[in-house]
Amino acid sequence: ILDAPLLTVHTLSGPFRVEGAQPGDLLIVDILDVGPIPQEDSGPLAGQGWGYTGIFSRNNGGGFLTEQFPDAYKAIWDFAGQTATSRHVPGVSFTGIIHPGLMGTAPSAGLLATWNNREGALIATDPDRVPPLALPPEAEHAILGGVPRDQWARVGSEAARTAPPRENGGNQDIKNFTKGSRVFYPVFVDGANLSMGDLHFSQGDGEITFCGAIEMGGFIDLRVDLIKGGMETYGVSENAIFMPGNVEPNYSHWLAFSGTSVTLDGEQKYLDSHLSYQRACLHAIDYLTKFGYSPEQAYLLLGSAPIEGRLSGVVDIPNSCSTVYLPTEIFDFDVRPSASGPFQIDPGMGAPSAANK
């Protein structure tokens, strides 16, 4: 995790050309099935009965709370049917919400240039920032398939990195892209050129540790169709719309934590929802440590368990309010506040770590 080669992550399956797809259409993608490597209960590869959650170090990608957690950590999760448990985060078990973190169509040449121009301009405002503000094209590590060799340098210098979500879909990390979901992607090039990857066994809203879902290898079974001229007909000029599947865990009891747009040292910010979600997560972490978890164990849990994150208020100046809903039924003990005080767990071996370089 400390030295994870981020230049080569997100190797995608595809692109798949869809016959008849043209710019302006909507590409319908049905997720018929998705899961870990089938009929594999154990093995050396993630997805063979296990997966992992990582906290990237601040100097190698970082995460949502990288200032509070600058080092690298991981948790290994074991799969039993739909359930995940971990020797590194004891006392919890939860039903996975299996989904692809990344899926989308190809951009047009003009849209690709727009991405590179705007992200390059952002990087230029603070080029030495750690972690960086954005990730520019990296020709040396671009996977260019059948592109003629004499064009590799040009194409590699323009090829978009797959880390962020963009107008084409991309790395949205929406945990609700489950089996049974139907997604409507805008089409920008002939054939649509659909790609996908980054399968997750489970994830909390926000994927807050960056490598925050339970990462795994696996399979996905898709069906595609088209709505001709659908981008104009339905006003979907950019970014996908989707209908979630109906296979999510049915948790009914929650403990919610809130945060506002005030920094840890008390500075007031204006309607900063990013900050308010950070504060809500930190409040949840502080709470879980009272039961015996280390802060890192709690952070890993929030990234991997099916927590719900919400923008609860975005208009009441100067503070936005974000909330994190933690399903209480995933714990082997009563995690709710009571007069008897917090139950003390045995934190076990803890989360393996490596110090930030």
Predicted features, each with a name:
Residues 10-16, 167-172, 285-287:
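Short alpha-helix capping/helix-loop boundary micro-motifs
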Residues 18-21, 177:
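Short, well-ordered loop/turn sites that connect or cap secondary structure elements
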Residues 26-29, 185:
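A generic structural signal for residues embedded in beta-strands
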Residues 33-178, 184:
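Intrinsically disordered, low-complexity linker/loop segments enriched in Gly/Pro
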Residues 34-49, 191-201, 311-314:
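Short, Lys/Arg- and Gly-enriched loop/turn segments at beta-strand edges
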Residues 123-125, 129-271:
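Conserved mixed alpha/beta catalytic, RNA-binding, or beta-rich assembly cores of soluble enzyme
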Residues 246-303, 307-310:
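Extended, compositionally biased non-globular segments
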Residues 285-357:
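TerminUS-proximal long segments
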